[in-house]
Amino acid sequence: MYKYIWIFSLTMVFGQYDYSLEDLNSTSEYYQESVGTSYFPNQVTLHYFGHYNWGTCTARFGQLNDLYEYLDSSGYDQVKLIGVGKSQHMNWLGNWTNENNAPVCADQSG
């Protein structure tokens, strides 16, 4: 048991990944702003990493966007969603931005 607590503690200390990417979704309230892990301090943020061109990823991002909008309209504005895909699949970006209002970013790092 102590081994798992130690691993969890190490993850909390050293497992902090930070990124900042431009929001490419024109219907998002953060459009063209650099969003990432540090952009929403003291808020719950879901970071969804997937492929713009895969049907499963597109469907899941749509479901998460629906949940994000439901929570926001219910007064839970402390919950945020950011979708991140690979830049080499930019021609399928519309799969995630059409009918979705959450920020969508493209990871430029290979």
Question: What is the meaning of each model-derived region?
Answer:
Residues 59-110:
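Conserved segment of the thioredoxin-like fold in thiol-based oxidoreductases
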Residues 26-29, 54, 74:
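Serine-centered coil/turn micro-motif
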Residues 38-41, 75:
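Short, flexible hinge/linker loops that cap or flank conserved catalytic cores
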Residues 11-38, 59:
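N-terminal "domain-start" segment that seeds a small globular fold
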Residues 1-9:
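Sec-dependent signal peptide recognition
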